[in-house]
């Protein structure tokens, strides 16, 4: 197995860090998977050769030497045998047909299972086309109704949603489940016989299995968040209750592809496997691919002889059996099962959402195999399809729950890391750099590890389990020598990464993550070997007993796993690498070529930059928001921290009849909300004032004045926490949608006792879209509003399955998750639960995407028995839909512009690199002092250009949080670069440049962001040059320095720059762009506005002043002095 090592050439902050580590991790995972394909193919070859020669297969030894390469054609042959094995299990029969003609192109040799009678044997009396053979029309083998069902399934867009199809043989009337799926050459029909007394023979029985699954899903959804272990324990209990298997396990795949049993329920006399770890080769990559295609796989009897599949000679390769449940297992898997005393098994895939970067799209590519739910039994038996489907349904629900749990876990981990980083930064200010190792929390608390160390200035500070000081120094020297061009290395095996001293570290230190913080200093995190955390969960052996390592068995798998991971640690997660990178960036910026006291001064300065409030900008935004709220067509109201109304727009005043003036200052809960809504609104208020914003909450408001005749105004609102400029919550704003008319009709409809058809079929626009389900989840009602919303008529959908045929077929849904969620909601409602405001979206007949809120209520007959459900759609108003569509179009345009910008950035970089290379060649020649200055000016202009192209996070700049570089620079070099950028325009217009810059200013050494101040001054100068009248015009640059003493021998220089020119000055709209955040009238105005924001990040400011005959930019900014001696020359 290849080492999980990563190098980092350079890092950027935030999302760039995460993207970099994710891409690296994705590449590593793919490489690991490809290496495992090689191992799997070789193991299969060894197993098959041992069988042919009569020798026993030494499983443990084969795994340990599995890393020898095999030819590519051998891997291809291996995959073909797994996916196109040409054998099935004898519990069912398989037919493959051409999809359009239904002509048989392949069939299994156990066709006698179909009881075809006289047709099964060719004879003179019967025409040849009636015999089950290649070319037979499969429809002739079944009853007319069965043939019609198969034809109906064949034209379905998503054929799997039509399963199972009940079919009967034409002669014997023997019933079968027909499970159909498409392959490259046609359609495969898996036929499984229905046994007498099978509880699932009727539609009611199939629905009952769904109800059992829904009950199990409800249990999962009721579990407390944040406990994946409890979730897995509950799943194995539910699956055992559904299937009755002797043993049910949850088997989780780790990042390095090995597996672990994380939950188990079993018969008391069976040996436990809980906690057992398996090597990655125990479940080959080819098998994992099969699980993604066919998520439930069953072995009825591992001892049964497989049945051969006969196929047409026209087919170019063996029939693909990936999607067929009867597909026979390979001999090695059957032998493994037999060795562990299991006869039949049921394996179900647990699929979760994969990484966006990894997936790169939708569909299966964006999904990831998280693990398996594995069932074993000691006697043979087939599980009927409806029960398998119910289990698959449960697995889909488990995948959804796991997605939420894993997201929550990632958020909690990230919060912990951010909190630790904040504390580490605080320590850095008080005691740099030793505070991050001598105080608590320390760097060891940043990520999960066994030890950590700081190597700084040739000295070591060590925490926990680490190498010795001499070994750490040796590792640092090795990194500098062999990985000198990278800023960090992370690996789960120092031995595999090539560190020559790995053997001397023993098992205590196997994995390492390092981050270089200066040219020769490092942070280290260490992990011990994985095997120390692994414990065998089985029965203890007598000392005299010995395991047979050659047999394929869980114990030999575990032994082989321990050999594989003996010198390997747990891999480093993406979020851990991101945390290390972030801390590395902070320290690299802080410790770059400066002493400790300089470090602290600079860090304080940098933090001050990031604490800008931008109160004037927030005020302008607030004014604009007030105007939008007052004129909005949606009802909007707001309350202060005490629940008193301080916002009441015209729309809510119109609906309630209460004028704005009277509403202000009233208590929302006590004066304006109906009693039945009080508890809901109080809870929403309480949560919002704590920062927890709720959505789609129903609020009933009282009516006044002209609206008094209405009982109430019913709003569905979203709560938004209102914050002041210091980010403290000061109130709550509610943005709502008026649903009064729909709610009144819906309530009457639900409560009605007699004939409801007059309401369902009413064309009244106030009637919401309504459809109904019978107890089998088939559509029994579809009103005119539903026809309008979906484009499908009543007659086209009545009697069809709501899941699959209507939603999923007629009205397409976005992905399998949407199908699963809708199925759960529908069955929960048919089980008696009421569903409120479930977000639901689909594509109508014309392909338009429709978003709605679904409310579902149970239907009962006179005896109170549940007979189905009523479902209501709440569709957003046309105005809101239009606004959303406009937003989507704007997002498309923005994305197109981003692509253009990315193209331009890339194409500019190439010639820029050429210029940089040419300059470096010039630097190596013999240059005069003036020529050296020209080359230096060119270099700083190149750096400015590079920085502008790299700084794409304008949103952070808008919010006042862009990160600034802090380094020593010479002010004279900056001024030369600024002037050089204006020289071409200056000469073209024949303008005179006047520079009034004191000599001490040119040589002044400062700390700050050299490139940013250069960009700001150059932008102001270029705009002045554009609007200076010519000829005989002039432009003057003046600099006035003032020294400030901070104490402790530290000095700050206040710099005043004046860029002056004669004439009328810059156009008024351009000056307005400089100071107006909301919009820009000109392209130049965008640059001016951004430069002003950059200046404010530096605690500076700019004004544009018009005086008689002249105008000028007045720029004020402060920088720390780099050397105290300079202070003596400044007054």
Curated annotation (Swiss-Prot):
Superkingdom field: Eukaryota
Span of domain PAS: 621-692, 755-826
Keyword Amino-acid biosynthesis (UniProt): no
Any Pfam family the entry gives: HisKA
Domain Histidine kinase: residue ranges: 903-1123
Single Gene Ontology BP annotation: regulation of DNA-templated transcription
Region (Disordered): 1-30
PTM comment: Contains one covalently linked phytochromobilin chromophore.
Matches recorded under SUPFAM superfamilies: ATPase domain of HSP90 chaperone/DNA topoisomerase II/histidine kinase, GAF domain-like, PYP-like sensor domain (PAS domain)
Ranges of Low complexity composition bias in the record: 9-29
Record key words, sorted: Chromophore, Photoreceptor protein, Receptor, Repeat, Sensory transduction, Transcription, Transcription regulation
GO MF term set: phosphorelay sensor kinase activity; photoreceptor activity; protein homodimerization activity
Binding site for phytochromobilin: 332
InterPro entries: GAF, GAF-like_dom_sf, HATPase_C_sf, His_kinase_dom, HisK_dim/P_dom, PAS, PAS-like_dom_sf, PAS_2
GAF domain span: 227-406
Record function comment: Regulatory photoreceptor which exists in two forms that are reversibly interconvertible by light: the Pr form that absorbs maximally in the red region of the spectrum and the Pfr form that absorbs maximally in the far-red region. Photoconversion of Pr to Pfr induces an array of morphogenic responses, whereas reconversion of Pfr to Pr cancels the induction of those responses. Pfr controls the expression of a number of nuclear genes including those encoding the small subunit of ribulose-bisphosphate carboxylase, chlorophyll A/B binding protein, protochlorophyllide reductase, rRNA, etc.
Homology family: Belongs to the phytochrome family.
PANTHER family noted in UniProt: OS08G0260000 PROTEIN, PHYTOCHROME 1
Record text on subunit structure and interactions: Homodimer.
Protein known as: Phytochrome
